[in-house]
Curated annotation (Swiss-Prot):
It comes from Campylobacter jejuni subsp. jejuni serotype O:6 (strain 81116 / NCTC 11828). This is 1-(5-phosphoribosyl)-5-[(5-phosphoribosylamino)methylideneamino] imidazole-4-carboxamide isomerase. It holds the Pfam family His_biosynth. Belongs to the HisA/HisF family. The active site is at residues 9, 131. GO terms for biological process: L-histidine biosynthetic process; L-tryptophan biosynthetic process. The gene is hisA.
Length: 244
């Protein structure tokens, strides 16, 4: 069944939202991250998603103490991403109690290391974040979305699916933080070609209709801004996915 996955982005312990990954376009929310995650858990969320934007910019400043506190205090699965660049960082996060670690640019820039991580920690512990942008074809963006690679999305998926990959987080970066709706066509395409891969959709979720459109296509839908801005609640999202 498709799950709603509430998300928080954190900079120095503060809940924020960026538009299209731009640190200059930052909105700060006056929420305590632990209280917010507890609220989402109480509402029925079975998984939570956290982006460590401080650690993404500077791995030496990764918010490990806070992440460990969050992982221990919530009773549902927590997945964490944000500029993971090494095997040591993956291990540190898993040791903190994180259920899954999200890996992004490394999948494109260092496939050997990425495959080592998949093998060492197992496919259930790793999510590949494949942030895409539509050129003549869907290509994967790297370096916090600052540049498009020459790698086509479907070729990357083909490569990793043959190496045991189970979970991906796919963001259409033209949609992220814009509340313009999700790219259903993109997720349908991935699901048709790679039915055994669990897809987490991200970017642009603006209404319950978006959730409805993704039911049965994606294993999860990551929702950040729409929940923080009160467009709909976790309870409404769960009901929508159960009834659609």
């Amino acid at each position: 069944m498709t799950q709603i996955i509430p998300a928080l982005d954190l900079i120095d312990g503060e809940v924020v939202r960026l538009v299209k990954g731009d640190y200059e376009q930052k909105k700060v929310y006056k929420y305590n991250p632990l209280e917010k995650f507890k609220e989402y858990e109480k509402a029925g969320a079975k998984e939570l998603h956290l982006v460590d934007l401080t650690g993404a910019k500077d791995p030496s400043k990764r918010q490990l103490a806070l992440i460990e506190k969050l992982a221990k205090e919530v009773n549902v699965n927590l997945q964490v991403g944000g500029g993971i660049r090494s095997k040591e960082e993956v291990k540190a996060l898993l040791d903190c109690g994180v259920k899954r670690v999200v890996i992004g640019s490394m999948a494109i820039k260092d496939a050997t290391l990425c495959l080592e991580i998949l093998k060492e920690f197992g496919s259930e512990a790793i999510v590949l974040a494949l942030d895409t942008i539509l050129k003549e074809d869907y290509v994967v963006a790297v370096n916090a979305w600052q540049e498009a690679s020459d790698k086509k999305l479907m070729e990357v998926l083909d490569f990793y699916s043959n190496k045991g990959l189970k979970h991906i987080l796919c963001t259409d970066i033209s949609k992220d933080g814009t509340m313009q709706g999700v790219n259903v066509r993109l997720y349908k395409l991935i699901h048709e070609i790679f039915p055994n891969i669990c897809i987490q959709a991200s970017g642009g979720v603006a209404s319950l209709k978006d959730l409805e459109n993704l039911k049965g296509i994606c294993s999860g839908v990551i929702v950040g801004k729409a929940l923080l801005d009160g467009v709909f609640s976790v309870e409404e999202g769960i009901r929508c996915l159960q009834n659609a």
